[in-house]
Amino acid sequence: MFISDPTDSLITPLPDLTAHSEAQSRNLGIPDWLKQIEADIATALEKGVDIRHLVEARAASIDSLLIELFKLHELTQTDLALFAVGGYGRGELSPYSDVDILILSPDTLSAEISQKVDGFVARLWDVGIEPGIAVRTIEDCLQVATDITVATNLLEARLLIGNDSLSAIPNNVVQQTWSQKEFYDAKMAEARARHLLHNGTEYNLEPDIKKSPGGLRDIHTIGWITKRYFRITKLYDLVPQDFLTEKEFDELMFAEGFLWRIRHHLHHLTGRNENKLLFDYQRDIAERMGYEQSEEDEPNAAVENFMRDYYRCAMQISTLSEMLTSHYYETLIEARLPESERPEKSVLNARFNRVGDHIAIAHHHVFAQHPEAILEMFLLMGQHGIKHIRTRTLRALKIAARGIDQHYRDNPLHKKLFLDNLKEQNYLFHRLRIMKRYGVLANYMPQFVNLIGLMQYDLFHRYTVDAHILLLIRMLHRFTSPKYQDDFALVGSIYKRIERKEIIVLAAIFHDIAKGRGGDHSELGERDAIEFCLSHGMSEADAKLIGWLTRYHLLMSMTAQKQDISDPEVVTKFANLVGNVTHLNHLYVLTVADMNATNPQLWNSWRASLMKQLYTQTRRILRADLDAPTNRQEMIATTRQQALTMLDKVDNQHMNREEVLALWDELGDEYFLREIPEAIMWHTEAILNHPPIGRASDANSEPLIVLREHRELALDAVQIFIYTQDQANLFAVTMAVFDQMNLDVLDARIITATRDFALDSYVLLDRHGTLLTDPESREELTRRLIDAFKNPETPKLVQKRLPRRLKNFQVPTTIDFNYNEASRQHVMSLTTLDQPGLLARIGQVFLNEGIEVHAARITTLGERAEDMFYISDIGDNMLSDAKLERLRTTLIDVLTPSC
């Protein structure tokens, strides 16, 4: 039977299969017809034809083809029945969707009928259908239906042609094999597993529009569990059953239509059954969907607007799916359980009850009669450790949230309840997540509306702004959890001592509140934060602190990652901006949480150690610690004394204090300013224990190269110390060797001793994790470096292709120079696209231009590399403006990816 008559649409009808030439005897001209169908659908899609019509029309066209071929192979003269199953059974086919069919027989096929079936199947392949086919008896179905995937396919079986008496068999098999609760439990387990494979979030950078949370599968799941009980054929049938409201149905259909349009464009764009919205496709799909990019817009405005609508759509589907599947359980499964198996019910107050681990309104009119109960409910959840809300209450909440207006926001009781919610830390992330999903947060804080689904088209910002803010608040909770104590020991101890945690929670909410408005979001957010806090009765001091945290929430991370925090002047300047220890403690906690909630893959122990170092150094200054050094010479003396104390505890016959001090006198002041005592200790041991290196005056000595695990880093992070005669191409050849061995540089400290020996320290990320465990890998790296140092010719660079993901981003190369009077060096700040061999290519340019590198700070933020180099000419002289401009031009030319 047809879903609809394809001739009534814009789709070309199936030609007469009996009127074909000899040359077409196998494919009957059908491949050309299938191509025409896809062209018709593409044209109709461009014209804005209702996507639902196109989905159903393609299924109807395939229906007509299969029916005619079934007849052509004389299968209508048998007891067989032909069913469409799966998505095709629902009557939903995108251009390259799977065409799954079931040929059902009452009994085992005879040889003659089996031969006809084989011919039918072969014909389908010949014409280009590539179907998924199952040929089964009723008994076969009963056996395989114990598999939930097979059972789901059978549940959606739709008879196309054949033995009409078999039409109800697939559905009956499912009913017979699976109880209502078993089927529900299996589908929920399946959904949880699917979501887990996609990071359990709707906000993946490259979402699978079918299987990710909030994808088409979540809508299908609603249909599957309800079809098992109600035996419906379409979702709208749930409305008369009072399971689904008209508005909920409309919301689901709108969201489904949006995803179908994306899926159709994806299939047309890729020419295959592609459901992953990769970066490669997002710009093209945005354009095809009508998202325009004007010259006045930001470079990524169109694609960001498109993805914002996708994320909002996914959140809507996910919210409805969670609510409706829970509603199914509560009303159709739990309600039928014996009293002893139902969740225990208790009274919280006159307005709310506790039902197991859920909260529920006491009667239908709670929110209408007591508007403050909207916020009271969330406070009760925190106070009583309740994580979930009953679905009847959620539906009432969704309606009530629409009534939150300016009058509601101005009510002093409501303001108090909102702040009380932020003070109550128990389940705060979960409570705010529900507030967001059901409209409470956006209606109470109108600024939040624009943040929902707002994304930044890059690899650094892993989540949408609204998701990021809530994840930041979840990170704050983790700082107090024993489970994460080892990961966040220092920040956790600080956060636990902060009594008024709502200060940081409010800073978390407001730190990105102004994104997407244009202008400096930190400054705009500061004004919003102060206004909100004062309007909610908070003190001026609290409001200013929250405003300050909002404005300067990036200060600490940028200082730690992009400046040389071994320079006392850098730390002192930062300390002056921070002002006091209270500001520092709050900023440190907020910054660590912010970085983790931005992109957990970019948070590593190296960044953690930078943050810790900046915090501890700044805290000493702000506390006016009498034992803390106050100038360069005092810092040098303190560092040397601490390192010497460590060395005195080392039992090593190759070292004595006189040897150590003699060596140190040759290393220069800069070394003791930039290295920590522990590093100086192991460097000194390495140098004095490896003759004939001994002293910098030994001109013929072999280079010393020592590797070890970084004490504050994960196992795949490696420290490498290089002590050798300085030479013009040292940085360039070192970077080239690291690149050849696929080692990423996290940090570089490049120091020249007073007698022209280099003391270079690098922190490397070993992608393969073999440097510390495999002696051959260590020997190979050491050998390559020594060979490169001995052969001063231009290092050979390895040509590498730009990774797929990076091809979709445009990061213009920008270079700024500042002269540092104290060090008499130029500080070169470079921003460019992170790309294979980046540092090696920069090093080669430095070599060719006669540039000496004294220090480097390497920072990678998603697809962006933001690096700093302290440079001079080979003679340590100031570079001329002309040379700086030539260096800038050359680097931009070298680092701009070719098309």
Curated annotation (Swiss-Prot):
InterPro entries tied to this protein: ACT-like_dom_sf, ACT_dom, HD/PDEase_dom, HD_domain, NT_sf, PII_UdlTrfase/GS_AdlTrfase, Polymerase_NTP_transf_dom, UTase/UR
Catalyzed chemical reaction(s) = [protein-PII]-L-tyrosine + UTP = [protein-PII]-uridylyl-L-tyrosine + diphosphate; [protein-PII]-uridylyl-L-tyrosine + H2O = [protein-PII]-L-tyrosine + UMP + H(+)
How is the enzymatic or functional activity of this protein modulated? Uridylyltransferase (UTase) activity is inhibited by glutamine, while glutamine activates uridylyl-removing (UR) activity.
Give the EC number(s) under which this enzyme is classified.
Answer: 2.7.7.59, 3.1.4.-
Q: Which residues form the ACT domain?
A: 719-804, 827-899
Query: What are its GO biological-process terms?
Result: regulation of nitrogen utilization
Positions of region (Uridylyl-removing): 348-718
Q: Which cofactor does it need?
A: Mg(2+)
Q: What keywords does the record list, in alphabetical order?
A: Hydrolase, Magnesium, Multifunctional enzyme, Nucleotidyltransferase, Repeat, Transferase
Give the SMART domains listed for this entry: HDc
Instruction: Enumerate the residue ranges of region (Uridylyltransferase).
Output: 1-347
Domain called HD: residue spans: 465-581
A Gene Ontology MF term for this entry? [protein-PII] uridylyltransferase activity
Query: Which Pfam family is an annotated match for this chain, by its short name?
Result: NTP_transf_2
User: Do you know which CDD domains this protein is assigned to?
Assistant: ACT_ACR-UUR-like_2 (cd04899), ACT_UUR-like_1 (cd04900), NT_GlnE_GlnD_like (cd05401)
* PANTHER family (alphabetical): BIFUNCTIONAL URIDYLYLTRANSFERASE/URIDYLYL-REMOVING ENZYME, BIFUNCTIONAL URIDYLYLTRANSFERASE_URIDYLYL-REMOVING ENZYME
Q: What does this protein do?
A: Modifies, by uridylylation and deuridylylation, the PII regulatory proteins (GlnB and homologs), in response to the nitrogen status of the cell that GlnD senses through the glutamine level. Under low glutamine levels, catalyzes the conversion of the PII proteins and UTP to PII-UMP and PPi, while under higher glutamine levels, GlnD hydrolyzes PII-UMP to PII and UMP (deuridylylation). Thus, controls uridylylation state and activity of the PII proteins, and plays an important role in the regulation of nitrogen assimilation and metabolism.
What the record says about family reads: Belongs to the GlnD family.
Question: What does the comment on domains in this protein's record state?
Answer: Has four distinct domains: an N-terminal nucleotidyltransferase (NT) domain responsible for UTase activity, a central HD domain that encodes UR activity, and two C-terminal ACT domains that seem to have a role in glutamine sensing.
What is the designated name of this protein? Bifunctional uridylyltransferase/uridylyl-removing enzyme
Q: What is the lineage of its organism?
A: Bacteria, Pseudomonadati, Pseudomonadota, Gammaproteobacteria, Moraxellales
